[in-house]
Amino acid sequence: MNTPFYVFMKLLPKCAVSRAFGFLTRLKLPVLSTVAKNWFASYYKLDMQEAEFPLEHYKNISELFIRHLKEGARPIANSEVVSPVDGVLSQSGPVENMIQAKGKTYTLASLLRDEKLAEQFAHGSFATIYLAPFNYHRIHSPVKGKVIGASYCPGTLWPVNKGSVERIEGLFCINE
């Protein structure tokens, strides 16, 4: 576990770095924002034909990151299961055997940080979908319903890339 990556990430003030990065992505400095948006769209090969507005419309990277899509850009498939997001399905299965990666498992109670809430989902299923920076970052409900509650689970801010998922024990349970 004590790889150079792990040691570096462990020592890195992740909360401060995250806040600083968030601040920088929300800056509305026309010249800097234009350069940053163009680089981001080019580097990650964003398909701006799907976006509701052209690249020039977005005032900063943050707005670009959470952009809306044009109506009909994501038609709902006629299938039993529909993904709520763009991304890659990395794991799925019964909640009694939740897999992080490479045999690392965790419990639903440790993920939710609530034993009673976890009991309500006993015998259910889970899916872990990884959203890369280039993915569309809005979540759409794959079923009709009404949100009746939400909870915030504070934690660390480890990256959730493949390297972290494979190396950090209980990553999804300790992350915010």
Where are the predicted features?
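Non-catalytic terminal segments and appended small domains
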Residues: 1-176
